[in-house]
Amino acid sequence: MNKHASQPRAIYYVVALQIWEYFSFYGMRALLILYLTNQLKYNDTHAYELFSAYCSLVYVTPILGGFLADKVLGNRMAVMLGALLMAIGHVVLGASEIHPSFLYLSLAIIVCGYGLFKSNVSCLLGELYEPTDPRRDGGFSLMYAAGNVGSIIAPIACGYAQEEYSWAMGFGLAAVGMIAGLVIFLCGNRHFTHTRGVNKKVLRATNFLLPNWGWLLVLLVATPALITILFWKEWSVYALIVATIIGLGVLAKIYRKAENQKQRKELGLIVTLTFFSMLFWAFAQQGGSSISLYIDRFVNRDMFGYTVPTAMFQSINAFAVMLCGVFLAWVVKESVAGNRTVRIWGKFALGLGLMSAGFCILTLSARWSAMYGHSSLPLMVLGLAVMGFAELFIDPVAMSQITRIEIPGVTGVLTGIYMLLSGAIANYLAGVIADQTSQASFDASGAINYSINAYIEVFDQITWGALACVGLVLMIWLYQALKFRNRALALES
C-alpha cells in the first residue's frame, strides 16, 4: 500500500457503494409509509406498525451479518451479498400491489441485505488501512459525508419518479441505484485483493450432516422467510424483546468484567447516554412516519406552481445534518479544558433542546393548519432542519464515548447494544407514538377525514417530553459540573 497517496484507491469504490446504498435505502424509506397509506390503503395504525417493525429489524440483523462476516464470508463478500439482496428486495417491493405477501417478503429481503451490508462496510473500509495509518480518520469521514449525499438525493429522485410515473418506478429507481453501486464496486475488485475473503476451510467443513456452505444457504433462505412471518403475523415485537433481553444480559456480563470503579463509571455513563439517545430517536423517527403523513395531508406543498412530492421533504433532514456538520467541524473548536463528562451532558442537553424546538415549530405548523386548512411550507422546512441539526449532538457524542471505554474487547459489543436500543427499540417506540395520530372519521360520502387535532396533541406532547429530558440532562450536567468544581477547589487548597 502506498503510504504517500492521499487515500488508497479502493476507498473510492467503497464510497461509491456507500452513496448508492444510502440512495437505495433512504429513497425507499421516504416512499414506504406513503405507499402503505395512499396506494395500498392501509389504515394509519397498520401502516405505522409495519413501518416501525421494518425500521426496528434493520437494526437487529446487522448482529447476525457481522457474525457471518467474521466467521465465514469476510467483509467484502458480505457487503456484496447484502447489496444484491437489497436490490432484489426493492424489485420485489414494486410488485407488492399484486399480493400483500410480496410486501412482507420484500421488506424481509431488504432487512437481511441491510444486516449483511451495514455491519460490514465500515469493517471493509478499516481493512484498507494499517492500524497506525494517519489517513484512516479521513477515510471514514469521507465515507460518512458521501452517505449523506446519497440520502439527500434519494428522496428527491425517488419521490419525483413516484409522483410523475408510478410507485413501482420509485422503488425501481432505488433498486437501480443499489445495482449501480454494486457494479461500480465490482469494477474495483482488483483493489481489494489484500482484504479478508471467504474462509473456504470453514465453509467446506461439515457440521450436523451438512457442509457449512449448505447451512449458509439454509440460513439465507430461512431468515427472510422467518422475518416475512414476523411482518405478516405482526410478531416483530417478540423478536425485539428477545434481542433486548440478550443485549441486557451481555451488558450485565460486561459490568462484571469491569476491573475497577473507573471502568464501571464509564459503563454507567454509556448506559445513561444510551437511554436518552433511545428517547431522542423515538422522537426523531417520527420524520418517516407521522410527520410524513402530516406533510402529505396538511401542508401546502405548492412552490412556484409545482407541488413538491411529500417524499422530497425527507431530504431536508439529511441536508441539515451535512451542512451543520461541516459548520461544526470547521468553525467550532472544542476546548480540552474542563471536564469531558460535563461537556458530554451539555451536548446532549443541546441536542434534546433542539429536538424540542423542532417539534415546537411543528406544533405551530399544525395549529396553523387547524386555523387555515393548510400550513406553510417554509415553517415545515425550518422545523425539519432544526431536528436534523439536533442529531449532531447525540449519536456522534455517544459513539465517541463508547470508543473511549477502557474495558478491553467490548467496544464492538457496546456499539451493537447501542444500535439495538437507540435504533431498534427507538423505532418501535416511534411507531407507538406515531399511532396516536391515527384518529380519523368518515363523512357521509365515506371519505376519510383525518384529525389535525391528533397531530397537534402528539407534536405538543413530544415538545414537552423532549423538554423534560432536557431538564433531567441539565440536572446531571449541573451535578457533574459542581462535582468537578469541588474537586478542583479541593486540589487547589
From Swiss-Prot:
Query: A single GO CC term, please?
Result: plasma membrane
Keyword GTP-binding assigned to the entry: answer is no
Which topology term describes how it sits in the membrane? Multi-pass membrane protein
Looking up InterPro entries in the UniProt record yields: AA/pep_transptr_DtpD, Dipep/tripep_permease, MFS_dom, MFS_trans_sf, MFS_Transporters, POT_fam, PTR2_symporter_CS
Which example biological process does GO assign this protein? protein transport
Stretches that traverse the bilayer: 14-34, 49-69, 78-98, 101-121, 138-158, 167-187, 212-232, 235-255, 267-287, 312-332, 344-364, 379-399, 413-433, 462-482
> Transmembrane helix as a keyword?
yes
Q: Which residue ranges does the entry give as Cytoplasmic-facing topology?
A: 1-13, 70-77, 122-137, 188-211, 256-266, 333-343, 400-412, 483-493
Q: Which UniProt keywords apply?
A: Cell inner membrane, Cell membrane, Membrane, Peptide transport, Protein transport, Transmembrane, Transmembrane helix, Transport
- GO molecular function terms here? dipeptide transmembrane transporter activity; peptide:proton symporter activity; tripeptide transmembrane transporter activity
Instruction: Kindly report every residue range on the membrane side named Periplasmic.
Output: 35-48, 99-100, 159-166, 233-234, 288-311, 365-378, 434-461
Please state where this protein is localized.
Cell inner membrane
- Describe its function: Probable proton-dependent permease that transports dipeptides.
What family is this?
Answer: Belongs to the major facilitator superfamily. Proton-dependent oligopeptide transporter (POT/PTR) (TC 2.A.17) family. DtpD subfamily.
Alphabetical list of PANTHER family matching this protein = PROTON-DEPENDENT OLIGOPEPTIDE FAMILY TRANSPORT PROTEIN, RESISTANCE PROTEIN MDTM, PUTATIVE-RELATED-RELATED
Q: What is this protein called?
A: Dipeptide permease D
Q: Which organism is it from?
A: Escherichia coli (strain K12)
